């Protein structure tokens, strides 16, 4: 809203970079190889700075530091659970103190509009960390009335060294989603940040130290997937790996985990989420929300509503209004408060998306607006809408991860369920209708980890998120998000005489 935007402090459009090395044991290190790589401002294509390029040797150092911090009797293992919660709250307070700086740095490195970085990403980071801070001393085992003269109870113990590999589309937020539950439950972390967007997560490393987390509890290695990421996934002394990214890389992570030490795996992968517009939907709201569902974050959302199914009797009106809305979308400098859409994250994504647009045209979808680059420098793409999309087209099956909307026509509710579920993905789905029966029927019939009814992209730290099918395994957020970070231990004790 305009009121919220006016409350956002003005950004420094050239935020200084303080942290561009590898963070191990609460200290900054160059890569063992001394190699660096550039991180680029996607608005201009210019290099922001060089960053230390971590590889297997650096991951090994980080894992050793984490393992040492997790030894029995260490300050971290001996710490009261309530104090782990206090540290997480302290970290959230420090992020809030530096919120304006972090939001500007996120925009510089990722390209998302600064107003969104400040109001959405940073807000959700704080809420996530504070939510998990509250869980630190409240997630615990049970006593169990076992048969015989025995006393039995369970402990929820930390898994140990957790490898966490985070993506470039929500760098700070995905860092919080990973750190919150891992640290609340007493684990130690080796995190690999995306090479496109390493800067904000590395700055948070400084705040982790300032908050008072013991050395080695959190270690952060910037680097590339095939080197640093692969080293984490196949490491024999990493107990668990959590990955957010593409389904293609998800396969590699699961294989690496299986062929090494069978480490626990949670995956949050791609999607091709159906957004179903019934003919009785509130049309103004449905058009705006379907636009938001696809175009938010430059279309770079794993759960984007990227197959918009519209019932035939409102199809023409919906298409016409969606095209008008896409044409009015403001693309430009992400530091300008009027901007709705910034650049794609890098040249690779930019070219890939333009390739998908070309394939849509070649396969016979109707290009209704957009379709090309939106500026002569940087990685900006025009908001693009395709109509008359058929299920078999590449743009209807594959994740584009860009500002390209596919609109498909359907007749009946039974038909749309079959078509919506006919995908290898199952991350999210949405339904717009005023009919309670249709909403309830569809929410149960759709194969997806999240179903939104008359809304889209509504997240709360309290509600779990994750995928069916090839969109991943495990859940993040909520109480469910703690399960992946704990082992349940049963302790059974012989007693002289059991009494009820």
UniProtKB/Swiss-Prot annotation:
Annotated metabolic or biological route of this protein: Alcohol metabolism; ethanol degradation; acetate from ethanol: step 2/2
One example GO MF annotation: aldehyde dehydrogenase (NAD+) activity
Entry keyword Acetylation: yes
EC code(s) of this entry: 1.2.1.3
Pfam families noted in UniProt: Aldedh
Residue(s) carrying N6-acetyllysine: 35, 56, 61, 142, 351, 358, 366, 390, 409, 411, 424, 434
Domain of life: Eukaryota
Family: Belongs to the aldehyde dehydrogenase family.
Function in brief: Required for clearance of cellular formaldehyde, a cytotoxic and carcinogenic metabolite that induces DNA damage.
Entry-linked PANTHER family: ALDEHYDE DEHYDROGENASE-RELATED
Identification of the protein by name: Aldehyde dehydrogenase, mitochondrial
Organism: Mesocricetus auratus
Lineage: Eukaryota, Metazoa, Chordata, Craniata, Vertebrata
């Amino acid at each position: 809203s305009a009121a919220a935007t006016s409350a956002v402090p003005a950004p420094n459009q050239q935020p200084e970079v303080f942290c561009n090395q590898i963070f191990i044991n609460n200290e900054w290190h160059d890569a063992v190889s001394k190699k660096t790589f550039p991180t680029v401002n996607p608005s201009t294509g210019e290099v922001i700075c060089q960053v230390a390029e971590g590889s297997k040797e650096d991951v090994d150092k980080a894992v050793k530091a984490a393992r040492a911090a997790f030894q029995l009797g260490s300050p971290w293992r001996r710490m009261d659970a309530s104090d782990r919660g206090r540290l997480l709250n302290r970290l959230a307070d420090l992020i809030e103190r530096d919120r304006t700086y972090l939001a500007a740095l996120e925009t510089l490195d990722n390209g998302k509009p600064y107003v969104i970085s400040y109001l959405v990403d940073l807000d959700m980071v704080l809420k996530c960390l504070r939510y998990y801070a509250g869980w630190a001393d409240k997630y615990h085992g049970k006593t169990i009335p076992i048969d015989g003269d025995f006393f039995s109870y369970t402990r929820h113990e930390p898994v140990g060294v957790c490898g966490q590999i985070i993506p470039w589309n929500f760098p700070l937020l995905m860092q919080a989603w990973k750190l919150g539950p891992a640290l609340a439950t007493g684990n130690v972390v080796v995190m690999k940040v995306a090479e496109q967007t390493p800067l904000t997560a590395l700055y948070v490393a400084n705040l982790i130290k300032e908050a008072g987390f013991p050395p080695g509890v959190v270690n952060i290695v910037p680097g590339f997937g095939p080197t640093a990421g692969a080293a984490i996934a196949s490491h024999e002394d990493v107990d668990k790996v959590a990955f957010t990214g593409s389904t293609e890389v998800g396969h590699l992570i699961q294989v690496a985990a299986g062929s090494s030490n069978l480490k626990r795996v949670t995956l949050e992968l791609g999607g091709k989420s159906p957004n179903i517009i019934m003919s009785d939907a509130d049309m103004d709201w449905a058009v705006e929300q379907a636009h938001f569902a696809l175009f938010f974050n430059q279309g770079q959302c794993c759960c984007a509503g990227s197959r918009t199914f519209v019932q035939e009797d409102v199809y023409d009106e919906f298409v016409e209004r969606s095209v008008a809305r896409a044409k009015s979308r403001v693309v430009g400098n992400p530091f300008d408060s009027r901007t709705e859409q910034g650049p794609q994250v890098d040249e690779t994504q930019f070219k890939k998306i333009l390739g998908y647009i070309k394939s849509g045209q070649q396969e016979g979808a109707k290009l209704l607006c957009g379709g090309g680059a939106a500026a002569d420098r940087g990685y900006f793409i025009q908001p693009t809408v395709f109509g008359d999309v058929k299920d078999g087209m590449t743009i209807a099956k594959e994740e584009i991860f860009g500002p390209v909307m596919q609109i498909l026509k359907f007749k009946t509710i039974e038909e749309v369920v079959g078509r919506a579920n006919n995908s290898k993905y199952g991350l999210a789905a949405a339904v717009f209708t005023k009919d309670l029966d249709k909403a309830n029927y569809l929410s149960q019939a759709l194969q997806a980890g999240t179903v939104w009814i008359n809304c889209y992209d509504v997240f709360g730290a309290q509600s779990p998120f994750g995928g069916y099918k090839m969109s991943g395994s495990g859940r993040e957020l909520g109480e469910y998000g703690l399960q992946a970070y704990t082992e349940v231990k049963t302790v059974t004790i012989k007693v002289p005489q059991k009494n009820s």
